[in-house]
Amino acid sequence: EGLLKAVRSLETGVCHIYHKKFDTMSNEGILAYIRKGTDDRIYAIAELIRRGVDLLHVYDNTKIDLFFLEKLKNIVEMENVVKANVGDVEVLRDAKRMGFSDKFIGQCWSMNQSEVFLMRKANNIFPVYKMIDTCAAEFNSDVPYLYSTYEEENESIVTDRKKIIVLGSGPIRIGQGVEFDYSTVH
């Protein structure tokens, strides 16, 4: 989930670990491309996995640990499940838990992003908010830094305090860093 959120947060217009520029490249061309670390290498690696290239071969060309390559493979395998099960609510729920965007699911299902959202809404598939453990479980900390996820338990505590909304963009934006977000709104 985190990886796909990170890809979307790059604000490059890409909503998934897919980039069309690798569609027409040969496997050999992509293997040569991934030998060097670039800002779009992850898309090239995902394309090789889609094509069934063995992860050990990808490892040999990137030296990226197999643990991480397996995580990319899990995402690619879920892409196949999504494409094969158009409109399936449980697949939608699982895809959201893996971090798939409504836009990408819509592309797989020949729907637009709004239609996927409405399907989620009709089936009560919404994000919940989890608390970030800022102390790595070393000791208890009640700092209300939250992130959204499609898991089950919501750790957000609703209060009766007055609410505000912060609008705008610039050097410090909401979502840039949790410590900045928190100081901006408290």
What spans do the regions from the language model cover?
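ATP-dependent carboxylate/acyl-activation modules
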Residues: 1-186
